[in-house]
């Protein structure tokens, strides 16, 4: 057993196998320093012979492609190391990832700065409260008395504004078009709700500046005495006995009951009674 092993060991450790192994070791050291080619590249695939491989997986000592694949890389490394124009250790000294991280950091900062306005716009709308998204309402617009009066006057004219009218009204009042539009929408919905309940909106009620509107509720009280006196006069002229004299006048003046018994011009009594029906009970002519 020992004799056979001693005989086979010199065959494995031959002089032909030693130089490629050293060159392979020399190649692996610069590949770790150089960032251009990783360790497992296309040149590493030439380490193994496609046809004749050793039982333990070592590469063939007489592989022609192995030497040819190493020569360009060795020459390139030699030129880079000697010339100094593009030194292979430059990336290793400064760090291969440093330029990438610098540019990456600048790009990341540019993205974050560009995304900041979007976050600022989105923050007032949604906010996390107790782990739940909650909409944050914008503060209500406080209108001045002048603005409210102008909006009310325009709303009485028309409940819907065109775009030019809305822009003109907003510019004259110092408001935005959105504020004017929302005010008109709220006013329309409020009036619809009031009319649905059967009530009259305050702006459509009779105004105090209209004299006819002020006098219209009092007109029955003003005309009632005149109507009552007219009705009394009508009944008095048409029906003389309908007058209401005092009870003593009936006892003192029997001529009211018997007009023909009067000694003076009885033919004038009916005419006089028709003209003055209320004067007969007060006194009689004898």
Swiss-Prot record:
Residue ranges: DNA binding: 136-195
Bias (Low complexity): 239-249
Keyword terms, alphabetized: Developmental protein, DNA-binding, Homeobox, Nucleus, Osteogenesis, Transcription, Transcription regulation
Protein name: Homeobox protein DLX-5
Organism superkingdom: Eukaryota
The keyword Nucleus appears for this protein: yes
Family note: Belongs to the distal-less homeobox family.
Function: Transcriptional factor involved in bone development. Could be involved in apical ectodermal ridge activity, pattern formation, and cartilage differentiation. Binds to DNA.
Gene source species: Gallus gallus (Chicken)
PROSITE patterns named in the record: HOMEOBOX_1 (PS00027), HOMEOBOX_2 (PS50071)
Pfam family, one: Homeodomain
Key word Nuclease present: no
Any single Gene Ontology cellular-component annotation: cytoplasm
Organism classification: Eukaryota, Metazoa, Chordata, Craniata, Vertebrata
Biased composition (Polar residues): 32-48, 205-219
Compartment list: Nucleus
GN (gene name): DLX5
InterPro entries in alphabetical order: Distal-less_Homeobox_TF, Distal-less_N, HD, HD_metazoa, Homeobox_CS, Homeodomain-like_sf, HTH_motif
Annotated spans, Disordered: 1-52, 197-286
GO molecular function: DNA-binding transcription activator activity, RNA polymerase II-specific; DNA-binding transcription factor activity, RNA polymerase II-specific; HMG box domain binding; RNA polymerase II cis-regulatory region sequence-specific DNA binding
GO biological process, one term: embryonic limb morphogenesis
